Design a protein with these regions (language model features):
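Carboxylate-rich, polar loop motifs that coordinate divalent cations or form catalytic acidic clusters
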Residues: 1-377
Length: 379
């Protein structure tokens, strides 16, 4: 009897996330766009902080949503050129990755100032900073497009650069896993997966062993799930499952299979064995046990469908709601209670998002959601 109960509980654990999304035709996405106050509909980053605010990074600046209204924050001396790629909250500050380096938002003063610290070789972070994470040793890790990876020790105030010359410094993402191991990926040149050798303080290629002939790992994003498996979302090779100890690699959702996903921009563990995947084909819910998936995309005949199929950041808020940033359709939301999506989009009103393209989302320590997007003039 106990064995049967455990089996039933296991089946429910596997099936409940799919049940929520099962009636795809009935899903109602709530949309938030420039018409609702976003500065742009192009969202690159999302984050909720410890206060519950949602911060939204767009190509036209930083937005904060308090559940009712959207507030726009400007970066010092940047004018309208405020494309935001990444957001991270720590030490009562928000670290903002832009196309021209890093800015810092101070909660006490509400000022946003540039991060001007240089390495011992007088190197400043001056290029697109597309990902920010923190390890257990209080180091912040920044991936850049052109300058490799930087490590900032928040205790000693020391900045260090890892150049990745073989990849021309074009890094896609960095991951701190459950064991405080640092991983990095690039999708340029000698694309692949790298692991930090802490003893020698250098990144080394982590060899992968694929089961099939699809061997490229031109990854854009990484995730470690609750079972400590690594997942890579790639540009043109689908979703890849990586055993971080053996290097065994398995490919799923490869575009050439006719049922895959192209240009995966985000991966989030929605529930055990359930991954939400943002891609240029829409939003996918992938079951890692059955290898089945559901695809949600925009439908011009359905005003409550996903606002745009180009899905970038995905986060889960403190209440279990899902926020989705899109490249042209602002922010979409699905409530944990109603199973309905909401969206935020760009409009002619001054309190709307700046554009229709959303690149990334991030939640800060106050519970605020941050996102990035480009100018409506460019969409």
């Amino acid at each position: 009897e106990n064995t049967m109960k455990r089996l039933v509980l296991l089946l429910l654990n596997l099936l409940m996330p799919m049940i929520l999304f099962a009636a795809s035709n009935d899903l109602c996405f709530r949309h938030f766009s420039v018409e609702d106050g976003l500065s742009s509909n192009s969202v690159r980053a999302l984050m909720q902080d410890k206060y519950g605010f949602l911060w939204i990074g767009t190509d036209e600046g930083l937005n904060r949503y308090d559940g009712t209204t959207v507030k726009l924050y400007r970066l010092k001396d940047r004018g309208a050129n405020e494309a935001i790629s990444s957001l991270y909250s720590t030490l009562n500050k928000i670290w903002i990755g832009t196309d021209e380096g890093i800015y810092i938002y101070d909660y006490e003063t509400e000022d946003i100032m540039p991060f001007v610290l240089a390495t011992s070789k007088n190197i400043h972070i001056e290029t697109n900073t597309n990902h920010i994470v923190e390890d257990k040793d209080k180091n912040l890790w920044f991936t850049t497009v052109g300058q490799g990876i930087f490590k900032y020790n928040t205790i000693t105030n020391h900045l260090e650069q890892y150049e990745f010359k073989n990849a021309n410094g074009l890094m896609a993402s960095v991951l701190v896993d459950s064991e405080n191991q640092i991983w990095a990926i690039t999708n340029w040149g000698n694309s692949g997966l790298f692991k930090l050798n802490k003893a020698e303080n250098k990144f080394e290629t982590f060899p992968l062993s694929y089961e099939s002939g699809k061997h490229d790992s031109n990854a854009l994003v990484m995730l470690e799930d609750s079972e400590h498996t690594l997942w890579l979302g790639t540009w043109e090779c689908g979703l890849q499952k990586i055993d971080k100890y053996s290097g065994k690699a398995t490919t799923y959702l490869h575009p050439t299979d006719g049922k895959g996903a192209t240009h995966i921009h985000s991966i989030m563990e929605y529930a055990p064995h359930q991954l939400l995947i943002g891609s240029d084909d829409g939003l996918l819910l992938f079951n890692t046990i059955t290898e089945e998936y559901q695809l949600f995309t925009e439908d011009e005949t359905n005003p409550h469908s996903l606002s745009n199929r180009f899905v970038y950041p995905i986060i889960k808020d403190h209440e279990g709601g899902i926020w989705i940033g899109t490249y042209y359709g602002g922010v979409n939301y699905i409530s944990p209670n109603t199973g309905q999506f909401e969206s935020f989009v760009h409009s002619r009103f001054s309190n709307s998002v700046n554009g229709t393209v959303i690149g990334r989302f991030c939640e800060d320590s106050n519970g605020c959601l941050l996102y990035t997007s480009p100018s409506p003039r460019d969409t």
